[in-house]
Amino acid sequence: MNVLFVDDHVACADMFADIAEGLGHRACVAHDGVSALQRCSEETFDLILLDIGLPDGDGRDVCCELRRSAHAQKTRIVALTGHVDLKGSSCMSDFDGCIVKPITMQALEDLLGAAMTPSV
């Protein structure tokens, strides 16, 4: 599975990528919204984990832009946020899921495993 991790915390993004690669996935990293959009225009991802708080804007706006692009319309996009109050709110409707930080290794492994299951 091809996974993109978008997080402005370099150490977190790199750790997520290392875990994914250790589980046999291909992992790429972007640290801001512009880089994420650029990566998605160059290749197709099966899963994008997208931080809400990015230095160049809101991850929700990046998600909306990705949903409009031909490259990521059907890609599973999961929000990463430190704000527990955002999980389940209507402003997160473009996302396929939401995980509240901090994320445990087990939660990341579970998410990657679930993303490999075809959607119904």
Model-predicted regions and their roles:
Residues 103-112:
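C-terminal output helix
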Residues 61, 83-99, 110:
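Alpha4 helix (beta4-alpha4-beta5 surface) of REC/receiver domains from two-component response regulators
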Residues 29-47:
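Acidic, metal-coordinating helix/loop segments flanking the phosphotransfer/catalytic sites
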Residues 78-80:
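Hydrophobic/aromatic residues positioned on beta-strands within the core alpha/beta folds
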Residues 51:
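Active-site residues of response regulator receiver
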Residues 55:
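The feature encodes the CheY-like receiver
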Residues 32, 58-62:
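Acidic catalytic/metal-coordinating carboxylates
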Residues 10-28:
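Two-component/phosphorelay signaling modules centered on CheY-like receiver
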